C-alpha cells in the first residue's frame, strides 16, 4: 500500500517533534506496530484510524485515513500513556489504556 502526507506537516514534525513520516513508514514496513484502533471520536473524525507505532521503545500515534489507492497519514503524536501501557504489556503486566480517560 502507498502512503501519502502533507509535506508542510512533515517539515513541521521534523522541526518540532524530531520525527518524520518517512521514519514512521520505515517502522510500519518493519512491523513495528503495537496496535491499530479506530479514532475514539468518529463523529469528528469519521473513518479515521490510529496506528500505534513503536519507535525506539516509544509509542507514536499516527492518525490516518485509508483511501482507495493509498493511506493518508495525518500527523504523528508522541504518547506517554500509550508508551506506559506498551511497556507494561512487554513486561507481562496488565494494563488498560483507555480505562481512566477516553482520550489518548
Which residue ranges define each predicted feature?
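Ribonuclease/tRNase effector modules and their secretory precursors
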Residues: 1-104
